[in-house]
């Protein structure tokens, strides 16, 4: 077999070499045929025939010689060195000592001298009777008669040509799409001998070979199976853009062939057929030969003779005249698109009309191959049919030179080559060009070079253009140019053509004639390569040139102006939606694809429906058997129940696979005593151990309708089902979605795309888990099951009803009927939505079915119910609750009806919008008005994982604003409705336990927990980390003003990026560059003195905040797993408007939390604080006491100065601050401030001491009503929001540390200290909350001995703190002395986190000294106050020496231990 393959390869190689040699001689034959006139054609043919005869004679002589040699060999014994014993064949190579003998033991059964008669008989049978050749070698014998040899070896062998392995013509050949017919490039995978069929006409074409492959698709050589005619079929890619391009080509060729060239005399390609095969558009053409580029390539890229070029140009001009009369532009004329009809003749035809368009109705701006691209296309102006004449001039020069005339490797390089040879482009052309400024410079004045050039391109305008240099172009366009190669030694066209080499065989006379021809040829090309399209010759003018007509040349040719075709730019005929080609109807592209998809999908659906029907029949039979068995068992149970005087709770185990299953678990089953009611029917679920794989239908005797349960997963506890809730089933039907593409309804899964059943069931409650209406339905129906699963008897088992009384049964049946009606309505709505073909789902709908099959949180997050048990107990419920629930359900039904009406309105709007978009899209595609190619599959939906099954209607955002507005309105309406329901329900039935809440459910309905809990936890971690990074970056980047607020003030704004601020947009304003530069310079020039150490502000868990209120402000890193219950106004009498004299937050205050009366509720601090001031009124609580730095109207921060009277700390109503913008409160809205996002951030802490420890608190007290410059260091807060038993505990809220200069620079006139009437001893905050509670517990649990020890420890701690305070005061005095020595500018501390210094604010140095003096006085006063408090504490300790057993509460200092 190896020898046979070698022989076949040799034969193939010889044929290829012979064809290559014939291609080399082809050009000479074409030239000879083109030179001879019609009179000499007969003589040339005779000469060729004679030459052929001579060649045949020579071949015959050679064959005779070969035969003689074979005969001689046979006479000598056939083969040299044959050993008949061993059947060994030897052959000698060389001679003498170097002689080598080759032994061949193959085919030893062929013995040459054995039985000549047998060999002759075999030869006669094979038809090899040759008297000259008595024997053939095994290679020749087995090559020619291989099939006969196989037949001899195996009599059962039969050769079938169709079973031969087929060669693949498409690369890559790996199937990927379109049912395995397409590869990764959407090309149809073609094999040799494939049959391509026109399904409409029944015409079949057999694939023979490949002719080429490109970006459009591929061209294959085929044979018509009916007529054996060879054709070329162009198979386009399975993409919509190429389909549209092929459709244009079909229409263009049809109009040219039928109307403008019906006799096929103008060298335009003929269209034979067109159809669709396997979703690919196929166009059948006549079969042609090689193109002109291949002809030049076969000539080793040497130019052709002027005579042959003349023959080609005449035919091309004839074709262009036809195109001009038809107002058609080819747009892609090049040597590759000009093909020879036959190898032996110069007849050509123009092909590839895929880029053709009508004049003045141009489709694309990126047309023509770069080497043949006209100047108007390069610059980006309106083009016409003259661009084809420019391409013809480039083709003419390339045929003569063998290389492209302008071989640019980029558009800039192409323009530079044209400018170098033909001059600068006309100014009129550059003025209209869209890309002119990209490649040219525009200068004022007149260009001196225009006078030297033949073409004056300035036209008397006051400006001129020059080409950009390579450096300028690379700098402006930010690109890098590749190096280009110059192929010609001359720059001008006449020099290049005249200096081209001559043939060596030419005589001097022939050279002179050739020079004259070249001069005429140069003038012809010069007229085609005019830069101005208006001066460029038309095809009619070019055809009258002496080079074409052969007339004598008397100088530069001046064309006839009357033959110049003035382009009328008439509107071309639009491509009709339906056109007929050879009796075959070509439909619109949308209809074609839809029909094909419908046919395929209909076949698949029919098969699926048949299978489903068979399965349903089998299931029904099984269910009937099970139902009969079940009825028998049920009758027996009912008889037992009727005999008993009391209702017994019986266990009915779930039967797995129709076998009884028993267990020792005592799971109660509440059954009815009525035997005739369908409520006693128990559904048998044939389940695997934990999952129900398929839905099972169950039909009762009273109602034959089938009930489909959703796919669920069951826990081990959910094996038992209570009989009271067995027949309360939700009827669900498969939803038929009307697909836009195929238009055929198909069954789809009830789960959303990409979803699977959760581990503990599917959500069926219409309310979210954090809603107060959640899980309040007493009946265990599929609609009232737990939100986290419908598994019966799970940890969150729902409450079931035992309808034992007649009234309860009636109400139960009414409720069941209403539920079924609601579900049916919802199903109908869903069907209507799907039939409309919308790809979007209504996210804001509250229908049950919209949320039936969505995955939610895991079972560990289920909110526990006060009546539920861990073993699936189902206690009875009273009638009062049933009536209330019926009222709630009626309200829900009304809400659902309103929502359904809203949905219908939305659907109608969406349908109208879709129709408009489809009409616009079809008109754009049919008319091809757009400047770019149509998108591929524009209607395909783009899925977003964040929506978990919900799809946006359009990814391009056509109607995003409208949909967003409607969604926001719906969300607001739903939120208002839910709030009303919650308030009503809380008034009627206050909840025992507050439902838990997750951070994801805080921000509205756009976020879902559709994945498993582990996956979502990972996503939450990513989201949290992003929020952390944003928070950290914003703190570093923003420049804050120092505010005198506590570290986490009770009235401080919420932390940025927290759930309370997620819905508020971050406002960004423009910062002038000059002010930014000034700020940067000031920062660089400022010194860096001592900076205080910042403390961490991590929130404390609410469990440890014994005295904190129930409102809690979470940090960005903490998960909110409980609800925020806002206290009502009646529970907080101190927050009434009558008790508060002033608005604490100002006019522009805003809070994300509000109480029932609309007032703002401040967020809760994360550190325990005093609440006393809140009892006395919000007016006494003062913070962020920042004075107005610039009293004049010209403020450096462009802040409007306002005035507002506020009340002091001591309760007096004297006005001490005339500026409403105290400390730049974050709750105020400063529209004129240019600092971005300044007031959305938490202010950093500050105090007046630079090195003062945060834990060393200074006592508060005393009265000082003077306007001093000291800041309050101890701010007392009340705890009126807590119960009355815990309102006596007072905690001091000390200000955090900061440098002296920073605080002074920010305060012009300080506030007054607080008069503290309570027993506060300045207790430090160094101990944590756990230590505080541990100390209280030990105090209560231990005896008097432990109590005394604790008192001693507290005294020791107080002494240590006093010592620390004294040390800190000494350090402060030392530092203050150092700062006094320095200049006022050095006394200012650097801005901490972007704080302003005194120089920036504009505070003079005298005020700083005054502030320092006032602060020293305040320190002395505070020290005296601390000493008084310590004395009071010691007196109280002496009085409270009674044993702790006789006391319930002990007040120690500012603490109350319970």
Swiss-Prot record:
Residues 205-548 form the Protein kinase domain. ATP binds at residues 211-219, 234. Disruption phenotype: Null cells fail to enter development, express low levels of cAMP receptors, are smaller than wild-type cells, are hypersensitive to nitrosoative/oxidative stress, and display slow growth on bacterial lawns. GO terms for biological process: adenylate cyclase-activating G protein-coupled cAMP receptor signaling pathway; aggregation involved in sorocarp development; chemotaxis; hyperosmotic response; negative regulation of gene expression; positive regulation of gene expression; regulation of G protein-coupled receptor signaling pathway; regulation of gene expression. Its EC number is 2.7.12.1. It comes from the Eukaryota. GO terms for molecular function: ATP binding; protein kinase activity; protein serine kinase activity; protein serine/threonine kinase activity; protein serine/threonine/tyrosine kinase activity; protein tyrosine kinase activity. It is found in: Cytoplasm. Residues 1128-1158, 1233-1245, 1280-1291, 1310-1321, 1331-1344 have a biased composition (Polar residues). Residues 32-83, 441-462, 545-571, 659-714, 791-874, 930-1095, 1128-1161, 1233-1347, 1375-1399, 1435-1458 are annotated as: Disordered. InterPro entries: Kinase-like_dom_sf (IPR011009), Prot_kinase_dom (IPR000719), Protein_kinase_ATP_BS (IPR017441), Ser/Thr_kinase_AS (IPR008271), Ser_Thr_dual-spec_kinase (IPR050494). The keyword Ribonucleoprotein does not apply. Residues 588-643, 878-927, 1346-1383, 1409-1442 form a coiled coil. The keyword Nucleotide-binding applies. Keywords: ATP-binding, Coiled coil, Cytoplasm, Kinase, Nucleotide-binding, Serine/threonine-protein kinase, Transferase. SMART domains: S_TKc (SM00220). It catalyses: L-seryl-[protein] + ATP = O-phospho-L-seryl-[protein] + ADP + H(+); L-threonyl-[protein] + ATP = O-phospho-L-threonyl-[protein] + ADP + H(+); L-tyrosyl-[protein] + ATP = O-phospho-L-tyrosyl-[protein] + ADP + H(+). General sensor of environmental conditions, such as heat stress, effecting changes through pkaC. Essential for survival to nitrosoative and oxidative stresses. Required for cell cycle control, not only at the onset but also during development (aggregation process and postaggregative development). PANTHER family: DUAL SPECIFICITY PROTEIN KINASE, HOMEODOMAIN INTERACTING PROTEIN KINASE, ISOFORM D. Belongs to the protein kinase superfamily. CMGC Ser/Thr protein kinase family. MNB/DYRK subfamily. This is Probable serine/threonine-protein kinase yakA. It comes from Dictyostelium discoideum.
């Amino acid at each position: 077999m190896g020898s046979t393959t070698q022989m076949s390869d040799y034969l193939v190689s010889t044929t290829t070499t012979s064809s290559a040699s014939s291609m080399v001689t082809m050009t000479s034959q074409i030239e000879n045929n083109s030179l001879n006139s019609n009179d000499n054609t007969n003589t040339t043919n005779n000469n060729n025939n004679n030459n052929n005869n001579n060649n045949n004679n020579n071949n015959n002589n050679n064959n005779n010689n070969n035969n003689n040699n074979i005969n001689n060999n046979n006479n000598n014994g056939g083969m040299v060195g044959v050993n008949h014993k061993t059947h060994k064949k030897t052959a000698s190579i060389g001679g003498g000592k170097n002689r080598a003998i080759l032994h061949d033991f193959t085919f030893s059964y062929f013995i040459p001298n054995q039985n000549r008669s047998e060999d002759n008989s075999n030869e006669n049978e094979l038809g090899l009777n040759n008297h000259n050749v008595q024997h053939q070698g095994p290679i020749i014998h087995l090559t020619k008669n291989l099939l006969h040899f196989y037949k001899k070896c195996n009599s059962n062998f039969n050769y079938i040509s169709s079973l031969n392995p087929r060669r693949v013509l498409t690369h890559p050949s790996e199937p990927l799409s379109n049912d395995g017919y397409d590869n990764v490039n959407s090309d149809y995978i073609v094999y040799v001998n494939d049959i391509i069929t026109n399904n409409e006409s029944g015409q079949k074409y057999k694939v023979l070979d490949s002719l080429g492959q490109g970006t459009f698709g591929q061209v294959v050589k085929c044979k018509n199976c009916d007529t054996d005619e060879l054709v070329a079929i162009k198979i386009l890619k399975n993409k919509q853009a190429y389909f549209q391009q092929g459709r244009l080509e079909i229409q263009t060729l049809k109009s040219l062939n039928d109307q403008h060239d019906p006799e096929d005399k103008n060298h335009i390609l003929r269209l034979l057929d067109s159809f669709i095969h396997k979703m690919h558009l196929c166009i059948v053409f006549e079969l042609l030969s090689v193109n002109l580029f291949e002809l030049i390539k076969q000539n080793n890229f040497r130019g052709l003779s002027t005579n042959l070029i003349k023959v080609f140009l005449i035919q091309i001009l004839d074709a262009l005249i036809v195109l001009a009369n038809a107002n058609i532009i080819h747009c892609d004329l090049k040597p590759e698109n000009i093909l020879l009809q036959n190898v032996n003749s110069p007849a050509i035809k123009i092909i590839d009309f895929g880029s053709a368009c009508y004049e003045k109705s141009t489709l694309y701006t990126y047309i023509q191959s770069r080497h043949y691209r006209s100047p108007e296309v390069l610059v980006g102006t309106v083009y016409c049919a003259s661009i084809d004449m420019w391409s013809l001039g480039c083709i003419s020069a390339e045929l003569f030179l063998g290389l492209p005339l302008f071989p640019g490797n980029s558009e800039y390089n192409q323009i530079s080559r044209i400018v170098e040879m033909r001059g600068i482009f006309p100014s009129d052309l550059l003025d209209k060009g869209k890309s002119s400024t990209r490649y040219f410079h525009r200068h004022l004045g007149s260009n001196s070079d225009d006078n030297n050039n033949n073409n004056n391109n300035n036209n008397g305008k006051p400006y001129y253009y020059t080409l950009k240099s390579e450096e300028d172009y690379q700098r402006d366009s930010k690109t890098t140019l590749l190096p280009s190669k110059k192929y010609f030694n001359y720059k001008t066209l006449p020099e290049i053509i005249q200096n081209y080499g001559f043939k060596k065989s030419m005589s001097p006379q022939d050279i002179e004639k050739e020079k004259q021809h070249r001069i005429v040829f140069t003038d012809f090309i010069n007229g085609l390569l005019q830069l101005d399209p208006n001066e460029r010759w038309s095809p009619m003018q070019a055809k009258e040139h002496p080079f074409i007509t052969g007339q004598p040349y008397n100088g530069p040719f001046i064309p006839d102006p009357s033959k110049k075709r003035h382009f009328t730019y008439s509107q071309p005929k639009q491509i009709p939606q339906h056109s007929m080609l050879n009796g075959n109807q070509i439909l619109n592209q949308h209809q074609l694809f839809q029909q094909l998809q419908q046919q395929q999908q209909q076949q698949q659906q029919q098969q699926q429906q048949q299978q489903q029907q068979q399965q349903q029949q089998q299931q029904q039979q099984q269910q009937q058997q099970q139902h009969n068995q079940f009825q028998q068992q049920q009758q027996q149970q009912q008889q037992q129940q009727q005999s008993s005087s009391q209702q017994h709770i019986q266990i009915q185990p779930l039967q797995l696979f129709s076998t009884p299953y028993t267990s020792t678990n005592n799971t109660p089953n509440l059954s009815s005593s009525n035997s005739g009611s369908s409520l006693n029917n128990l559904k048998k679920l044939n389940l695997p151990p934990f999952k129900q794989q398929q839905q099972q239908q169950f039909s009762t005797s009273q109602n034959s309708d089938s009930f489909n349960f959703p796919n669920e997963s069951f826990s081990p506890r959910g094996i038992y089902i209570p009989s009271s809730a067995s027949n309360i089933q939700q009827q669900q039907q498969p939803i038929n979605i009307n697909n836009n593409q195929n238009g055929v309804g198909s069954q789809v899964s009830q789960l959303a795309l990409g979803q699977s059943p959760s581990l503990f069931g599917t959500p069926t409650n219409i309310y979210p888990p954090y809603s107060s209406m959640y899980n309040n339905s007493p009946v265990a129906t599929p609609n009232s099951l737990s939100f986290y699963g419908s598994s019966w008897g799970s940890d969150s088992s729902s409450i079931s009803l035992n309808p034992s009384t007649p009234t309860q049964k009636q109400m139960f049946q009414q409720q069941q009927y209403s539920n079924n009606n609601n579900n049916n309505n919802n199903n109908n709505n869903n069907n209507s939505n799907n039939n409309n073909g919308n790809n979007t789902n209504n996210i804001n709908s509250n229908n049950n079915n919209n949320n039936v099959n969505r995955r939610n949180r895991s079972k560990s997050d289920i909110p526990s119910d006060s009546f539920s048990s861990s073993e699936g107990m189902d206690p009875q419920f009273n009638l009062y609750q049933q009536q209330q629930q019926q009222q709630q359900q009626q309200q829900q039904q009304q809400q659902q009806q309103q929502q359904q009406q809203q949905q219908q309105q939305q659907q109608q709007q969406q349908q109208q919008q879709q129709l408009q978009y489809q009409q616009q899209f079809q008109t754009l595609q049919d008319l091809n008005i757009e400047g770019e190619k149509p998108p591929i599959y524009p209607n395909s939906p783009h899925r977003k994982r964040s929506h978990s099954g919900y799809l946006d209607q359009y990814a391009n955002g056509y109607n995003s604003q409208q949909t967003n507005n409607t969604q926001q309105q719906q969300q607001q309406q739903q939120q208002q409705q839910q709030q009303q329901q919650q308030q009503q329900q809380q008034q009627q039935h206050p909840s025992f336990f507050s439902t838990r809440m997750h951070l994801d459910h805080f921000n509205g309905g756009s976020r879902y927990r559709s994945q498993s809990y582990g996956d979502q936890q990972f996503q939450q971690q990513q989201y949290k980390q992003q929020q952390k990074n944003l928070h950290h970056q914003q703190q570093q980047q923003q420049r804050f003003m120092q505010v005198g607020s506590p570290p986490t003030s009770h009235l401080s704004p919420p932390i940025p990026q927290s759930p309370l601020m997620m819905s508020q947009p971050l406002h960004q304003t423009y910062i002038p560059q000059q002010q930014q530069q000034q700020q940067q310079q000031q920062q660089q020039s400022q010194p860096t003195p001592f900076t205080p150490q910042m403390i961490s502000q991590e929130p404390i868990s609410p469990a440890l905040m014994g005295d904190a209120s129930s409102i809690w402000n979470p940090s960005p890193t903490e998960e909110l797993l409980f609800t925020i219950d806002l206290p009502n106004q009646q529970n907080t009498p101190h927050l009434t408007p009558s008790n508060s004299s002033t608005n604490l937050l100002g006019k522009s205050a805003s809070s994300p939390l509000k109480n029932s009366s609309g007032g703002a509720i401040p967020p809760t601090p994360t550190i325990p604080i005093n609440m006393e001031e809140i009892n006395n009124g919000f007016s006494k609580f003062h913070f962020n006491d920042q004075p107005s730095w610039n009293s004049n109207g010209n403020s450096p921060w462009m802040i409007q100065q306002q005035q507002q009277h506020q009340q002091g700390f001591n309760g007096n109503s004297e006005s001490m601050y005339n500026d409403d913008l105290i400390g730049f409160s974050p709750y105020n809205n400063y529209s004129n401030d240019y600092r971005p996002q300044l007031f959305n951030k938490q202010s950093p802490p500050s105090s007046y001491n630079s090195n003062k420890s945060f834990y060393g608190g200074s006592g508060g007290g005393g009265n000082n009503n003077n306007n001093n410059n000291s800041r309050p260091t101890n701010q007392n807060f009340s705890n009126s929001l807590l119960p009355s038993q815990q309102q006596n505990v007072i905690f001091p809220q000390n200000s955090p540390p900061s440098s002296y200069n920073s605080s002074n620079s920010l305060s012009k006139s300080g506030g007054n200290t607080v008069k503290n009437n309570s027993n506060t001893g300045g207790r430090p905050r160094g101990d944590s909350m756990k230590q505080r509670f541990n100390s209280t517990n030990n105090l209560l649990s231990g005896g008097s001995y432990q109590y005394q020890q604790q008192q001693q420890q507290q005294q020791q701690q107080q002494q240590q703190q006093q010592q620390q305070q004294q040390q800190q005061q000494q350090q402060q005095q030392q530092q203050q002395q150092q700062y006094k020595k320095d200049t006022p500018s050095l006394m200012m501390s650097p801005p901490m986190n972007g704080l302003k210094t005194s120089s920036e604010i504009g505070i003079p140095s005298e005020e700083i000294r005054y502030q320092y003096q006032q602060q020293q006085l305040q320190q002395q006063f505070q020290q005296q106050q601390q000493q008084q408090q310590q004395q009071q504490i010691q007196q109280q300790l002496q009085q409270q020496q009674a044993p702790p057993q006789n006391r319930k509460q002990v007040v120690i200092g500012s603490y109350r231990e319970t």
